[in-house]
Amino acid sequence: MASKSGSGGLREPPNEQAVLNMYEGKRSELSQIYSNITDLEMQVSEHSLVINAIQPLDQSRKCFRMIGGVLVERTIKEVLPAVQRNKDGLEEVVRKLYETLEKKKKDLTEFEAKYKIRITKQEDNKEGGNKKEGNAQGVLVGAASSSQ
């Protein structure tokens, strides 16, 4: 028992299931970060579209902006800098998320190496590949017989 507490019992999972749970948690975090990045990149793209659409227009022209669920009338001169600031802020958040993503990927890779985790999806793909190959054989046989 002394060896368990000496090795940092909180850091070492007690069994295989705990390792699996920790691994799945890390993969889930990565998935959430990817999802957040995708959403924010979409917002950056939308901000760019708005900027490109209103930039060439007369600066005193009316435009409407949604602020906290309320549509507010402003001028392009007032709205354009705010939209640009929002876009810049979103781009900064995306950059930070990419940095976090790289750290989490490295952490996951180290975790996989430490516990010798191998993805078993390759076996699933082989089984799926055999099924597809069986289907493909039927197609190939038909194609082969028509070419003879």
Swiss-Prot record:
Q: Which UniProt keywords apply?
A: Chaperone, Coiled coil, Cytoplasm, Nucleus
Coiled-coil ranges from the UniProt annotation: 87-114
A Gene Ontology biological process in which this protein takes part is:
cortical microtubule organization
Which Gene Ontology terms of cellular component type are present? cytoplasm; nucleus; prefoldin complex
Q: Which Pfam families match?
A: Prefoldin_2
Its chief place of residence is cytoplasm
Q: What happens when the gene is disrupted?
A: Smaller plants. Lower pre-mRNA splicing events and reduced production of U6 snRNA in plants lacking PFD2, PFD4 and PFD6, probably due to a reduced activity of the LSM2-8 complex.
Q: Where is this region: Disordered?
A: 122-148
| CDD domains (UniProt xref) | Prefoldin_2
Assembly: Heterohexamer of two PFD-alpha type and four PFD-beta type subunits forming prefoldin co-chaperone complex. Interacts with LSM8, a specific subunit of the LSM2-8 complex, which is a core component of the spliceosome.
Main role?
Binds specifically to cytosolic chaperonin (c-CPN) and transfers target proteins to it. Binds to nascent polypeptide chain and promotes folding in an environment in which there are many competing pathways for nonnative proteins. Together with other chaperonins, contribute to the regulation of gene expression by modulating the spliceosome function on pre-mRNA splicing post-transcriptionally by acting as a co-chaperone of Hsp90 to control levels of LSM8. Required for microtubules (MTs) organization and dynamicity.
Sequence similarity:
Belongs to the prefoldin subunit beta family.
Q: Which PANTHER family match?
A: PREFOLDIN SUBUNIT 2 (PTHR13303)
Protein's name according to its UniProt entry: Prefoldin subunit 2
Its gene name is PFD2
